[in-house]
């Protein structure tokens, strides 16, 4: 009820302004009695994946809390895990505004944010300040001005810094809003990146005395052959998981709507079936050797169950969470428990 009132007010505003306002209020109330406005008591429905046990299978996708400012607040809502980021080695402003657009009739969003974040050192301070036992994944990326050929170095810098504080690390090579980034999903660049990250993980596990799993986040705009090659590379490098999928450059299901022609990645309801298809194809190629976190267009509990049926072990929500509110977390966990 409270969310519907807040949403009505927020949806009158520019999407990015509304987002910043929400993050600000969650940041200030996460550990106060005021979190009663959004806190939920969700009965555990544990999932073991990547050697970790999550309290339930519903996570918050990266991009909502880029700088890890509201981890305790999202934990209070009942998320089984919270993926913060995407974070880069150095702070960067992202692309020019406006860069985020609602497509309300389609329950969709188009964004071209461009990895705006306050940098990895700032994120680390926020991770150190977390007061709850939230499971936090950290999504890492490269700075816009780092050449793609040297992109690997940015991922290694971020991995080194967040490793002691992350439950897992997600490697984002699939945002459509950083020029050239998606080229890291192919061939030698991919093999080199995965191999280097895996080597770094071994060194860091020894140094810190703990193993932090690494997952690769992929795009939905891939051919069957490309998905197969990525799966082979993941198996070969012994990565711990895949996250499928990021936003899409396609505009299926939104053509003719206000803002549909804006550049950027489309998320929300229209992405649901495409991302589920990619999960199914990826699962078929991985043959159970790596688990999958399914994300993209989940707007109701049934959408989440479809992704689990397609081969995902857990799910994440973002746009559906904006349109439906915290109740969506509870709905999915309840449906999962019944299933």
From Swiss-Prot:
Statement: the UniProt record of this protein carries the keyword Cell membrane: yes
The gene name on file is pyrD
Please name the pathway: Pyrimidine metabolism; UMP biosynthesis via de novo pathway; orotate from (S)-dihydroorotate (quinone route): step 1/1
Read off the HAMAP family from this record: DHO_dh_type2
Cofactor section: FMN
| Cofactor binding mode and count | Binds 1 FMN per subunit.
Protein name per the record: Dihydroorotate dehydrogenase (quinone)
Gene Ontology molecular-function annotations = dihydroorotate dehydrogenase (quinone) activity
Which residues does the Swiss-Prot or TrEMBL record annotate as the active site?
175 (nucleophile)
List, alphabetically, the GO terms of the cellular component aspect.
cytoplasm; plasma membrane
Report the top EC class in one word: oxidoreductase
Quote the catalytic activity from the record: (S)-dihydroorotate + a quinone = orotate + a quinol
Q: Indicate the segments annotated as coiled coil, or none if absent.
A: none
For whether the record's keyword set contains Chloroplast, the answer is no
Cite a single GO BP annotation.
'de novo' pyrimidine nucleobase biosynthetic process
Catalytic activity, EC: 1.3.5.2
Membrane topology (UniProt):
Peripheral membrane protein
């Amino acid at each position: 009820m409270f969310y519907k009132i807040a949403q009505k007010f927020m949806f009158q505003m520019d999407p990015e302004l509304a987002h910043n306002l929400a993050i600000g209020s969650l940041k200030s109330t996460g550990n106060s009695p005021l979190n009663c406005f959004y806190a939920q008591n969700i009965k555990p429905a544990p999932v073991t994946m990547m050697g970790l046990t999550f309290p339930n299978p519903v996570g918050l996708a990266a991009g909502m809390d880029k700088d890890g400012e509201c981890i305790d607040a999202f934990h209070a809502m009942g998320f089984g895990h919270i993926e913060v980021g995407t974070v880069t080695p150095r702070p960067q402003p992202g692309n020019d505004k406006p860069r985020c657009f609602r497509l309300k009739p389609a329950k969709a969003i188009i964004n071209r944010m461009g990895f705006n974040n306050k940098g990895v050192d700032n994120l680390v301070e926020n991770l150190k300040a977390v007061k709850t036992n939230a499971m936090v994944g950290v999504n890492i990326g490269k700075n816009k001005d780092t050449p793609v050929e040297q992109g690997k170095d940015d991922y290694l810098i971020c991995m080194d810094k967040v490793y002691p504080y992350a439950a897992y690390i997600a490697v984002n090579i699939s945002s459509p809003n950083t020029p050239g980034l998606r080229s890291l999903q192919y061939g030698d660049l991919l093999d080199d990146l995965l191999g280097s990250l895996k080597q770094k993980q071994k060194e860091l596990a020894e140094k810190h005395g703990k193993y932090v799993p690494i997952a690769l986040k992929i795009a939905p705009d891939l051919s069957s052959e490309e998905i197969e090659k990525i799966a082979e590379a993941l198996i070969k490098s012994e990565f711990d998981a895949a996250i499928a999928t990021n936003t899409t450059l396609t505009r299926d299901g939104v053509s003719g709507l206000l803002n549909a022609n804006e550049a950027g990645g489309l998320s929300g309801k229209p992405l649901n079936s495409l991302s589920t298809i990619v999960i199914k194809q990826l699962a078929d190629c991985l043959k159970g050797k790596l688990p999958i976190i399914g994300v993209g267009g989940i707007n109701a509990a049934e959408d989440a169950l479809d992704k689990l049926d397609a081969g995902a072990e857990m799910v994440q929500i973002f746009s559906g969470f904006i349109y439906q509110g915290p109740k969506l977390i509870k709905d999915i966990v309840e449906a999962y428990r019944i299933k």
